[in-house]
């Protein structure tokens, strides 16, 4: 946003340099990115009156001009501009003067004729071509009215000015207007803010007799209003208005269009002006566009619309694309006599979608996208009518035609001085706090110690108590807040929370096993959003994704981990082991916030041990992956259970479901060969666990176990069981019958093949017995061991 200091003084006048003002504004949180000084590098620039023009005798494209500069004698200037003519009032750089770019003006002879100065175009005095009025793009600037010769040209053009360029954050849309900025400056300097003139001399004719309005999509257009103005005289706008627009980065067109743009910058409220006679009916109907409906916009482009677009129609055909751009056949032209001035509130999301899809970003659409101040909608329309009456000789019809409700102009928020003081760290009185809010234009009252602040609709960045506290600190001045040391009743040393400690343990365990931590995108493509998801839940899609590949919130960490491994393998890094701790997202239906759950996932491919001097290479496999997961559980003092399962995307015979305390929390498995091949991977193993579920289990401290004082006894058994029986089932039976002397169990061999019936397998298990209080006897061990064997037999196991 470009803020002219000369324009700002219409609303608030502070006795400060622009540099001091910019520094103060920056300290309150609105960054002034640059100060544009239109007087910089310019010297001896005056208004000249062209008394005569004669052709140059030695050059076809040059003219010899006698120019009155307000001095005793006119000066002779040779000029090559095609539009120079006798009687004009022009910009002249005198001899000894300077122009931007280091141009020095000297006496010279051009094709034998002396020239004592230079008649200038706007571009030559530092005005950008893209904002220069079209009729002066390729020639000198001509004042529309007589100006006294010798007058400072910068003063006559309202360029004796400095312009602040704001770098605004998206939440400060209120500063996208001169009045919004004036409220801010008035609060900073505790001075009065002056509002512009609004009242017109209305005729006795009523606009309601000429126009009706109907809105069929009130959810998208909660308020729509219009006023009618007759007998408009189309012409150039006054010089002061043209150059305020130029300094704001907008090209002047004519008085009607310029007034619309001027009010946009003044109030931050976009307006649209229709040629009333070209609308084609006496009614305006606002609705959603029909799918594949078309209209031609002001830029001459034929636009194909969607049913998500808002259109303004004459009851039948679109005459404007609501909040984005008008239609070409109802635009204001030199033949326009009667004008309809529109002011409305449009749904920000709809405007954003339409403007981005059609690539029609404008000053208007950008303001609608951020949300506009309801308090200014009707004011802005009235201001435009006043300016049309004043500068276009128009007649304003009485009455406003409107549809819908503007709603409340304020949002009340309750706060206390104690809350403010505890937050900012020093004490202000109720009166001081209320005074700050009143300076900002917030109506405030004190009720029994509670400060009720009525926040105006222009400040959409303020919605909670903390926002109000920020305003107090900003306006009081961050630099003026006294420095104080914090006071603590009890001082304690910092320490990790339980979750932080566990997370550090998990990371150390995984990294000790050779895995590297990865951090991947939370967004995946829609096609992969539910890959590997244990829960059948709805997905959450972005309304405006950066790309299709990042359009949906993930329900698993594995899709991007697979991408990361594939990326590495494609670049000859074939031994990759990664883990990630991150959030996944499960939908709860439209309008509800999703559930965010933290997951722990890992992926391994290639060789786990690949250095030849260490011996035989050891490729990663299912049991290695399972061992890493079990090691994590052991470090957290958790007991995981495993059972065979099926997960889409994993090998049907090499997948296990992981459960904790009877609840499924994840899985381990080998990537399905087809999926691995699609990613150019060899055998690849993954795991994914509900990390939140792991963290929720309270296990207390992991106690130290002393070295046993008495010797233990080990017994090995081999069991022939059906193929579908798992080792965990056997171990469970063993532990149930091992009484208090069974210390540990270990599966050390699994065999399938010759010497066994089809559908059978042999599992070898080592049982360790230990009595921490006494020496074990054979009788005691045999009794417990036999009990275990009998229990195994009852469950179908054959002792080999």
Swiss-Prot record:
Subcellular location: Cytoplasm
Note accompanying the cofactor annotation: Binds 2 magnesium ions per tetramer.
SMART domains the UniProt entry points to: B3_4, B5, FDX-ACB
UniProt superkingdom: Bacteria
Binding site for Mg(2+): 461, 467, 470-471
Family affiliation: Belongs to the phenylalanyl-tRNA synthetase beta subunit family. Type 1 subfamily.
Record-given protein name: Phenylalanine--tRNA ligase beta subunit
Domain B5: 408-483
Species this protein is from: Staphylococcus epidermidis (strain ATCC 35984 / DSM 28319 / BCRC 17069 / CCUG 31568 / BM 3577 / RP62A)
Any single biological process term in GO: phenylalanyl-tRNA aminoacylation
Major place of residence: cytoplasm
CDD domains linked: PheRS_beta_core, tRNA_bind_bactPheRS
EC number(s) recorded for this UniProt protein: 6.1.1.20
Keyword annotations from UniProtKB, A to Z: Aminoacyl-tRNA synthetase, ATP-binding, Cytoplasm, Ligase, Magnesium, Metal-binding, Nucleotide-binding, Protein biosynthesis, RNA-binding, tRNA-binding
HAMAP family (UniProt xref): Phe_tRNA_synth_beta1
Subunit composition and interactions: Tetramer of two alpha and two beta subunits.
Catalysed reactions, as listed in the record: tRNA(Phe) + L-phenylalanine + ATP = L-phenylalanyl-tRNA(Phe) + AMP + diphosphate + H(+)
Ranges of residues in domain tRNA-binding: 39-154
Residues in FDX-ACB domain copies: 708-800
């Amino acid at each position: 946003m470009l803020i002219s200091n000369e324009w700002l003084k219409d609303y608030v006048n502070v006795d400060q340099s622009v540099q001091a003002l910019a520094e103060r504004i920056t300290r309150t949180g609105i960054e002034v990115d640059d100060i544009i000084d239109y007087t910089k590098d310019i010297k001896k620039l005056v208004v000249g009156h062209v008394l005569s023009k004669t052709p140059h005798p030695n050059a076809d494209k040059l003219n010899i001009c006698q120019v009155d500069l307000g001095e005793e004698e006119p000066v002779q200037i040779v000029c090559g501009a095609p539009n120079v003519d006798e009687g004009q009032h022009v910009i002249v750089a005198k001899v000894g003067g300077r122009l931007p770019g280091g141009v020095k003006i000297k006496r010279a002879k051009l094709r034998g004729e002396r020239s004592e100065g230079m008649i200038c175009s706007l571009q030559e005095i530092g005005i950008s071509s893209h904002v220069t009025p079209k009729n002066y793009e390729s020639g000198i600037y001509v004042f529309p009215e007589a100006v006294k010769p010798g007058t400072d040209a910068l003063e006559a053009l309202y360029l004796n000015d400095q312009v602040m360029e704001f770098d605004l954050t998206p939440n400060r849309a209120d500063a996208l207007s001169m009045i919004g900025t004036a409220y801010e400056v008035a609060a900073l300097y505790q001075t009065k803010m002056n509002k512009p003139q609004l009242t017109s001399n209305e005729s006795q004719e009523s606009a309601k007799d000429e126009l009706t309005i109907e809105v069929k999509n009130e959810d998208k257009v909660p308020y729509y209003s219009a006023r009618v103005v007759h007998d408009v005289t189309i012409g150039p706008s006054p010089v002061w208005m043209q150059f305020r627009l130029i300094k704001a980065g907008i090209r002047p067109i004519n008085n009607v269009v310029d007034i619309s743009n001027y009010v946009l910058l003044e109030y931050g409220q976009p307006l649209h002006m229709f040629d009333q006679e070209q609308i084609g009916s006496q009614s305006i109907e606002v609705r959603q566009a029909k799918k594949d409906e078309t209209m031609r916009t002001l830029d001459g482009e034929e636009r194909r619309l969607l049913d998500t677009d808002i259109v303004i129609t004459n009851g039948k055909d679109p005459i404007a694309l609501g909040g984005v751009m008008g239609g070409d056949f109802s635009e204001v032209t030199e033949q326009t006599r009667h004008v309809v001035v529109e002011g409305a509130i449009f749904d920000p999301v709809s405007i954003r979608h339409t403007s981005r899809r059609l690539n029609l970003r404008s000053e208007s659409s950008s303001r609608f996208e951020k949300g506009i101040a309801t308090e200014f909608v009707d004011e802005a329309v009235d201001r435009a009518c006043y300016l049309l009456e004043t500068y276009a000789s128009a007649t304003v019809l009485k009455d406003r035609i409107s549809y819908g409700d503007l709603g409340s102009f304020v949002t009340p928020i309750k706060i206390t001085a104690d809350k403010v003081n505890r937050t900012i760290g020093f004490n202000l009185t109720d009166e001081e706090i209320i005074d700050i809010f009143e300076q900002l234009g917030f109506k405030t009252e004190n009720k029994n110690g509670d400060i009720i602040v009525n926040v105006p609709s222009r400040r959409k960045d303020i919605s909670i108590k903390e926002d109000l506290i920020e305003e107090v600190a900003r306006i009081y001045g961050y630099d003026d807040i006294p420095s104080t040391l914090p006071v603590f009743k009890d001082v304690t040393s910092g320490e990790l929370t339980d979750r932080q400690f566990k997370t550090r343990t998990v990371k150390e365990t995984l990294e000790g096993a050779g895995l590297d931590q990865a951090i991947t995108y939370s967004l995946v493509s829609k096609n992969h959003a539910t890959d590997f998801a244990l829960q059948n839940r709805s997905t959450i899609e972005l309304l405006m994704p950066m790309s299709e590949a990042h359009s949906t919130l993930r329900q698993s960490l594995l899709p991007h981990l697979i991408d990361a491994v594939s990326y590495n393998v494609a670049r000859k890094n074939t031994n990759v082991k990664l883990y990630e701790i991150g959030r996944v997202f499960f939908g709860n239906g439209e309008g509800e916030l999703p559930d965010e759950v933290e997951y722990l996932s890992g992926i391994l491919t290639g060789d786990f041990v690949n250095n030849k001097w260490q011996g035989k290479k050891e490729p990663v496999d299912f049991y290695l992956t399972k061992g890493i997961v079990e090691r994590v559980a052991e470090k957290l003092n958790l007991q995981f259970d495993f059972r065979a399962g099926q997960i889409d995307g994993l090998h049907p015979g090499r997948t296990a479901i992981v459960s904790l305390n009877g609840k499924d929390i994840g899985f381990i498995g080998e990537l399905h060969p087809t999926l691995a091949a699609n990613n150019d991977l060899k055998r690849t193993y993954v795991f994914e666990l509900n990390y939140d579920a792991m963290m929720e289990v309270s296990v207390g401290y992991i106690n130290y176990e002393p070295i046993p004082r008495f010797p233990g006894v080990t017994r090995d058994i081999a069991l022939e069981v059906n193929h579908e029986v798992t080792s965990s089932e056997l171990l469970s039976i063993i532990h149930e019958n091992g009484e208090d002397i069974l210390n540990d169990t270990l599966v050390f061999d699994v065999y399938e093949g010759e010497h066994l019936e089809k559908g059978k397998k042999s599992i070898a298990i080592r049982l360790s017995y230990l009595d921490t209080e006494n020496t074990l006897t054979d009788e005691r061990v045999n009794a417990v061991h036999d009990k275990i064997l009998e229990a195994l037999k009852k469950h179908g196991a054959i002792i080999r």
